[in-house]
Swiss-Prot record:
Annotated binding of ATP, by residue: 29-32, 50, 86-90, 415, 495
Function: Together with its co-chaperonin GroES, plays an essential role in assisting protein folding. The GroEL-GroES system forms a nano-cage that allows encapsulation of the non-native substrate proteins and provides a physical environment optimized to promote and accelerate protein folding.
GO BP, sorted A to Z: protein refolding
Gene: groEL
Lineage: Bacteria, Pseudomonadati, Bacteroidota, Bacteroidia, Bacteroidales
Record protein name field: Chaperonin GroEL
Length: 545
């Protein structure tokens, strides 16, 4: 396919048009008085959102050159979302500002490479300043609530629910977001370990109203292979029957013949039993079975370690205070594993989290850690309509990411104030030549933009507010929600330092690429592509009736 090539100013102007198209759509969502954006969907109702990255992801422009500009800034939003989970709109605004002012300077004859060096120098200074300003969150759940509220666009209910979930499961715990059946947004905590495997047969159910298997003080048999014939299990079954306690079997699978025998005995009342499949796949399954064994004080019966099912003894079985199994999940509460064993397993998983490079593996390890250490909280998001539910779920996920970021690197004054305070770090900073110093000035101007935009979205005059905030010190800033200048820490207008840092780093990184671009190549559009030829006739079928 033929290519179209644009050089120099022409290429940069087209890219900038794309940047502005995307950034202008995204930046209206910033701040407590940010506006909604409605996204048309091919199927179903339109999606209403105030989430910057959701807006950015929807944007595709017709002109391939403009589209490239938009896609580059989309990358800023996505990367910031991946790294910090929030701050996508801020990153987009910063990128637009650095690119806009930077291109004017390049057009006026500045050296793009020197500008980029100056920008990088300034960003480094600002990031160091932000780190110095950051205050640790620790176990201050009020701060966590404030961060969550700000990130959820000022929704106090979401803020308090996330703080409650964090309080219940601590830092190690996992918090997941699900859609609720009703209109209320609630938080539920699953104590103990839960994994996503339910009973193999509904005939094991003990509570028919809830369709659940409920067991008090059961023994737990953990086997890493398929149980093909019941004969292998008979010795251990006979021993558990004599104790009169129920038995939970966790195995890779159970053959239909062996399962039928267990079900018949369960229905006769001679066995209190339930069987579930082992969670996970491959190596992760082995690790999860080992976790369950450590939590319940049992042993994984595995031929790899020289143990056979027919030789299993009672001391290889784990125990727990209570086990609940429904059609989808198994929950083990208060396993009888010893505290030292669980603690060393937790340390081991934490070390694996540190060393892994895969985000997917990290997420799965984090889940395993939560199941052993803190428990799992589920935030059920409810709303009157599906459209509202999706919008609310976006905000809850943002708020959750922001609180995690705040716990990691602390908090700074919100509402764009942290950037205004960081201008002080650039005051005496000079580059090695004039263009580098211009690069520093570009960043100095750009970091005012988030506050200007928050103020503009609140319907006020940006320049006046920025000047007044500059005159103040520390956490003195503008609260756009109440239209008051005040100390932002005391009123809970705070942002995670990590989000503030990542937004600027990613914006400057893409902007630097932009300014140093000299040529853009895209596919050439064909004016009138020829219509495809009609398929041939159905010759040779004349004899059919």
């Amino acid at each position: 396919m033929a290519k179209e090539i644009k050089f120099d100013m022409e290429s940069r102007d087209l890219l900038k048009k794309g940047v502005d198209a995307l950034a202008n759509a995204v930046k209206v969502t910033l701040g407590p008085k940010g506006r909604n954006v409605i996204l048309s969907k091919t199927y179903g109702a339109p999606h209403i959102t105030k989430d910057g990255v959701s807006v950015a992801k929807e944007i595709e422009l017709e002109c391939p050159f403009e589209n490239m500009g938009a896609q580059l800034v989309k990358e800023v939003a996505s990367k910031t979302n991946d790294d910090a989970g929030d701050g996508t709109t801020t990153a987009t605004i910063l990128a637009q500002s650095i690119i806009g002012v930077g291109l004017k300077n390049v057009t006026a004859g500045a050296n793009p490479m020197d500008l980029k060096r100056g920008i990088d120098k300034a960003v480094k200074a600002v990031v160091t300043h932000i780190a110095g300003m950051a205050k640790e969150v620790g176990d201050d759940f009020q701060k966590i609530e404030h961060v969550a509220k700000i990130s959820a666009n000022g929704d106090e209910n979401i803020g308090s629910l996330i703080a409650e979930a964090m309080r219940k499961v601590k830092k190690e715990g996992v918090i997941t977001v699900e859609e609720a059946k009703g209109t209320d947004t609630t938080v539920e905590v699953v104590e103990g370990m839960q994994f996503d495997r339910g009973y193999i047969s509904p005939y094991f159910v003990t509570n028919t109203d809830k369709m659940e298997v409920q067991m008090e003080n059961p023994f737990i048999l953990i086997y890493d292979k398929k149980i093909s014939v019941l004969k292998e299990m008979l010795p251990i079954l006979e021993q558990t029957v004599q104790t009169g306690k129920p038995l939970l079997i966790i195995a890779e699978d159970i053959d239909s013949e062996a399962l039928a025998t267990l079900v018949v005995n369960r229905l006769r009342g001679s066995l209190k039993i339930c069987a579930v499949k082992a969670p996970g796949f491959g190596d992760r399954r082995k690790a999860m079975l080992e976790d369950i064994a450590i939590l319940t004080g049992g042993t994984v019966i595995s031929e790899e370690t020289g143990l056979k099912l027919e030789n299993a003894t009672m001391d290889m079985l784990g125990t727990a205070e209570k086990v609940t199994v429904d059609k989808d999940n198994t929950t083990i509460v208060n396993g009888a594993g010893n505290k030292e064993g669980i603690a060393s397993r937790i340390t081991q998983i934490k070390a694996q989290i540190e060393n892994t490079t895969s985000d997917y593996d990290r997420e799965k390890l984090q889940e395993r850690l939560a199941k052993l250490a803190g428990g799992v909280a589920v935030l059920y998001v409810g709303a009157a309509s599906e459209v509202e539910m999706k919008e609310k779920k976006d905000r809850v996920e943002d708020a959750l990411s922001a609180t995690r970021a705040a716990i990691e690197e602390g908090t700074v004054p919100g509402g764009g104030t942290a950037y205004i305070r960081a201008i002080a770090a650039l005051e005496g900073l000079k580059g090695e030549n004039e263009d580098e110093t211009t690069g520093i000035e570009i960043v100095k101007r750009a970091i005012e933009e988030p506050l200007r935009q928050i103020v503009a979205n609140a319907g006020k005059e940006g320049a006046v507010v920025v000047q007044k905030v500059k005159e103040g010190k520390d956490d003195f800033g503008y609260n756009a929600r109440t239209d008051v200048f005040e100390n932002l820490y005391s009123t809970g207008v705070i942002d995670p330092a990590k989000v503030t840092r990542v937004a600027l780093e990613n914006a400057a990184s893409i902007a630097g690429m932009f300014l140093t671009t000299e040529c853009v190549i895209a596919d050439k559009k064909e004016d009138n592509p020829a219509a495809p030829a009609m398929p041939g006739g159905m010759g040779g079928m004349g004899g059919m009736m």
